[in-house]
Amino acid sequence: ETLKESTQQSLWIELFAGGRYSSHSTNDLRKESLEKFLTNAVDLTGFLTKDEFRRLADPELYEGQSKVDLDLNDSGQADITAEQRQERAKQLGAYLEGKDERIISVASGVYDSHSESYQLASNGFEGQKESTSFTQGVSVSLQGKGDKKPEGWRYYRARHLNDLVGAEQIAKEALART
């Protein structure tokens, strides 16, 4: 019944300055805003208490880091349409139709995300990561004894769409947990 879709971008920085550490984030990526954001972040870090134990890692610790592909990204995620997401959510709820006369309500959800990050440190560290995440699940409310209304749910998450547990199994488990 309700379909929501969004795209988000943000910048997150960690500062190690003068023996102090701070982290800052913003989703305002306009050049003039970023300049002020960075200036303020550096200035604010100067007000913090020094922390002798918080510092950049020794470059020897990440020298020769592996370039192995950890298979964190499903390249097909970008091709999934809003209609396909809606159909998957409907399928989750459809498996519960008529399964128990005590069912009051069913809510299903399908979520997927794509994330890219790039890290660069002043001590020479450089790294990047790209990953996807897929989640689908359902919650169900039943009419219990008297005015009790127990609720059960089941959600699964995977890095790749094809690795997700099927809609029928998810629906059965949610009902069994109620």
Q: What is each PLM-predicted segment?
A:
Residues 1-178:
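Active-site bordering "gate/hinge" segments
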